[in-house]
Regions:
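Short beta-strand-to-loop acidic/aromatic patch adjacent to the donor-nucleotide binding site
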Residues: 100-114
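Terminal low-complexity segments of carbohydrate-biosynthetic enzymes
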Residues: 224-302
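A conserved acidic beta->alpha catalytic loop
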Residues: 37, 53-63, 81, 113-114
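Conserved donor nucleotide-binding strand/loop of the catalytic core
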Residues: 62-94, 98
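Acidic helix N-cap motif at the loop->helix transition within catalytic regions
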Residues: 30-32, 58-67, 78, 118
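Conserved donor NDP-sugar-binding/catalytic core segment of glycosyltransferases
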Residues: 114-149
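Short, acidic, metal-binding catalytic loop of nucleotide-sugar glycosyltransferases
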Residues: 13, 36-46
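A conserved hydrophobic helix/loop-capping motif in glycosyltransferases and polysaccharide synthases
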Residues: 18-30, 34, 41, 52
């Protein structure tokens, strides 16, 4: 007779645990909510979560260690260098082959984001239903510009660092081709999205169908309250970073198109000497922060 007993605590142990990378740099205030959100988004799922604590000078590591005692499958990976790109590289090239090789799907998340109910299942289904796609992305369900951001991501078939997934075979290719994100790069998700659409060959035109945005897969994050001066300065810095992101990508795009994926610099600042060729473009109010970004990139070389 067949054993029709439900598995203990609702788990289907035949399913491989889902690997999740979480980037965390000084996230002691948000990391528990982030981790909690995964478990409540996918009740009954087993996870293999790796919190990539990079350059933390706060209590992030202590918080994660305590959390891992009470929750199966939560692992702290402690990295001295505070750089999100380096932490991503460590996950893909060191953690995956050793700890979670040959999985069908890998999830990636920021330590200050929260996954909405069913978000990971939606992305897994997105990849299953679109065998041609290398990646499935979640969309924001909060934030001031949420409506615009969602529309843009659906139109451009975009991916943002807050929450996305990569097909296992694509991760294998990243490992095989030794693809590493440049250190100090601002737009890690922008570059990754481009590499996915290029199918790791920047000589080819972009193929938008390589990314599946999943409207039912959502994430939330804390917005800046507009009340205190410290938030204004944080917002200003964020706008400068957005400016830098565009300029870095301009330098990188040119180089990759002409020299191929092997031309990815180990550190994005290697390309800063060419920032003298970049032109300041009018962008309304953001022209000012763009100008600041450009000055900083040029000053870096002096």
């Amino acid at each position: 007779s067949m054993n029709t007993q439900p598995p203990p605590n609702g788990r289907h142990d035949t399913q491989a645990a889902w690997p999740v990378m979480i980037l965390a740099h000084n996230e002691e205030k948000h990391i528990v909510a982030c981790l909690d959100s995964l478990f409540s988004a996918e009740p009954g799922r087993r996870f293999e979560i790796f919190v990539m604590a990079n350059g933390c000078t706060d209590g992030t590591e202590t918080v994660v260690n305590e959390y891992s005692r009470a929750h199966d499958g939560v692992n702290l990976i402690s990295i001295p260098l505070g750089d999100k790109n380096n932490a991503w590289n460590v996950f893909v090239h060191d953690v995956v082959p050793l700890r979670v090789p040959d999985r069908e799907i890998y999830f990636f998340m920021d330590g200050d984001a929260r996954a909405c109910r069913g978000a990971l299942t939606e992305m897994a289904n997105g990849l299953r239903e679109n065998p041609y796609a290398h990646a499935a992305s979640a969309l924001p369900t909060s934030g001031r510009s949420m409506g615009r951001d969602r529309a843009e991501m659906l139109k451009d078939r975009g991916l943002v660092a807050n929450l996305y997934s990569l097909r296992g075979n694509f991760v294998k290719e990243l490992i095989r081709k030794k693809v590493r994100l440049p250190l100090k790069l601002e737009g890690d998700d922008g570059l990754l999205g481009a590499l996915i659409k290029w199918d790791l060959d920047p000589g080819k035109p972009w193929d938008m169908n390589r990314i599946v945005p999943c409207p039912k897969a959502g994430f939330t994050f804390e917005s800046f309250p507009w009340t205190s001066p410290s938030h204004w300065s944080a917002y200003w810095r964020r706008m400068v970073r957005y400016g830098r992101r565009k300029y870095e990508f301009e330098l990188l795009g040119k180089k990759l198109k002409s020299e191929g994926i092997g031309a990815l610099p180990a550190d994005i600042t290697e390309l800063y000497p060419q920032s003298s060729t970049l032109k300041l473009r009018w962008a309304g109010i953001h022209t000012i922060t763009n100008w600041v970004a450009l000055q900083e990139m040029r000053r870096f070389c002096k």
